[in-house]
Amino acid sequence: SNSITNDSKSYNGLINVFNSPISEFTINSLANGCMPLLVDFEDISLTNNSIVNWQWDFGDGGASSFQNPIYDYTSDGNFSVSLIVTDANGCQSLSTQLNSIDVYKMPVANFLADISFSCNQTELVTFTNNTLGLANYSWIFGDGITSNLVNPSHNYALGVYSVSLIANVGTCIDTFVRNNYIEIGAELNSDFI
């Protein structure tokens, strides 16, 4: 004969349920600029228990386990930063700041003109921008006129002019100056024997 028994056991005790920490952080320095860019991060996570572990992901392959790291971004790009905190109970929390870091390559300004010397009383000069890196441009033609074009042309009157090109990406700025570069209405000095 088959007999069925109902065995039951009961346990007395407490089941502890812990609140998870709330992962949060701030950036205490410039979050955009030229590479290399040094960025100061501060953990401001909330918890009822002590946090025992920090796992930072800086978005460029770099990581840290310090509570308040300072990180050096050495490549250009836009980066998201994440922090996972673990409290003494083993509870974890993740926070991410998307696209929070912008690192730019420093532009290197340079240019040439198609004409730098002319005997004419006026001359249309075309400039070729040879700047390394993408940038915004400000030209100063030396006669009170400016331009923001990449490769501008400018009509010069009689005189000698210094020309400047300012290239900027965010807060990264480079200036290139050619002093006394454009000479219009100059006389040729020829000595014939």
Label the predicted regions.
Residues S1-I193:
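Extracellular/lumenal mature domains of secreted and surface-exposed proteins
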